[in-house]
Amino acid sequence: MEIKEYENNPYHLAQLVDLINYCQNIEAKLDIKMAEQDDIFQIENYYQNRKGQFWIALENEKVVGSIALLRLDDKTAVLKEFFTYPKYRGNPVRLDRKLFERFMLFARASKFTRIVLDTPEKEKRSHFFYENQGFKQITRDKLDVDYIFPDRDSRIYVKLLD
């Protein structure tokens, strides 16, 4: 298993789209169209050229996980596009934790002091993961930054970094 920064590759992009579609629409039944998240088709410009990053996890050259950091300003970043196929979650692989650790290393090295994220209300497994990582749920009116996301009755979480 390898976690690496995304490089423009049509084969990996197609697999990333499959992963996201599986997690959002087949598994979670959220009915989110790729047109609602066109950042996936402009990773370099949307994330990497703006002092953020996008990582993919590969097993035998197959994309099995992803996570992204979107820079909003010098202090705030958004955790986005965090997906893994079910068999890679939890023990024994723990890809979810490995991707999150990579994200946090970059966030701390980049001197962000706050991470925000959104996640659909019905994604209880995600809520549990984020809360175990120190994220606190906030109401939307407490979110003082703006970013685009496919809202599905979403919860907003924040984590302050040391």
Where are these regions (language model features)?
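C-terminal "cap" of GNAT-fold acetyltransferases
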Residues: E2, Y22, T113-V116, P120-K124, ...
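Acetyl-CoA-dependent GNAT
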Residues: E5-Y88, F100-R102, F106, L160-L161
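Short, solvent-exposed loop/helix junctions and linker helices
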Residues: P10, P92-V93, D151
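Residue-level signal for short amphipathic helical patches enriched in basic/charged
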Residues: D31, S110, D118
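A generic secondary-structure micro-motif detector
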Residues: K33, P92-V93, V116
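Glycine-centered flexibility sites
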Residues: G52, G65-A68, R94-D96, G134, ...
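Conserved glycine-rich acetyl-CoA-binding loop
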Residues: K62, Y85-E101, A109-S110, E121-H127, ...
